[in-house]
Amino acid sequence: SDVYKRQLIDNTVVTTVMSNFGLYKAFDAAGIDYAKTKVGDKYVYECMVNNGYRLGGEQSGHIIFSKYATTGDGIITALKMMEVMIAKKMTLSQLAAPLQIYPQVLKNIRVYDKTAAQDDTDVKAAVDKVAESLGNDGRILVRESGTELVVRVMVEAGTHEECEKYVDDVIAVIKEKGYAVE
């Protein structure tokens, strides 16, 4: 609602690169801007502090209302959701109806060298081919794990089958190039 949109600073919500593609489509439809950070609520909060934003969160459910807390807080999130439900006289399912969650497949592949695997021209070409095939109906994200020798390949598309196929296509190239630890 407009009352709640006006509470956003610069009409912006902070998310991570792993937030569902459907969330971004819903934000676009509602005229809400978003800032994307690396995965981790510490990066979400850092972006919020650096830019003065009030609302941010991760797909994992860590929702941060910077006016009330510095970390995700389930009780605050529940209270804020109830506040909106009461003000709009709508159920949670009615509020969430415009949000179409896209099927998502995320696979990890253990590699010898995360950076080399991700920067390889053939791997990049495979990723670009998937991105081109998806167009505006999905997305691909390939990123290094911050804690282990793993490259994460994530695809969101119209069907689970599409996601599986595209993720497997990219992983096949990583394996063909000899980066995978078998």
Task: Identify the residue ranges that each predicted region occupies.
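Short, small-residue-biased leader/transition segments that mark boundaries at the very start
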Residues: 3-4
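Phosphate-binding and adjacent anionic-ligand microenvironments
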Residues: 8-182
